Amino acid sequence: MAQDIISTISDLVKWIIDTVNKFTKK
């Protein structure tokens, strides 16, 4: 169960980083 939460958080972090990169690399 903890692993599911960790993997979900890591997926969220990856998505946030990708989104931030898109906006900062105009």
UniProtKB/Swiss-Prot annotation:
Protein name per its UniProtKB record: Delta-hemolysin
Entry GO MF terms: toxin activity
Residues recorded as bearing N-formylmethionine in the entry: M1
Chain's gene name: hld
Organism listed in the record: Staphylococcus aureus (strain MSSA476)
Predominant location: secreted
One GO CC annotation: host cell plasma membrane
UniProt-listed InterPro entries: Delta_lysin (IPR008034)
Pfam families recorded: Delta_lysin
Biological processes, Gene Ontology terms: symbiont-mediated hemolysis of host erythrocyte
Highest taxon above the source species: Bacteria
Cited function: Lyses erythrocytes and many other mammalian cells.
Family: Belongs to the delta-lysin family.
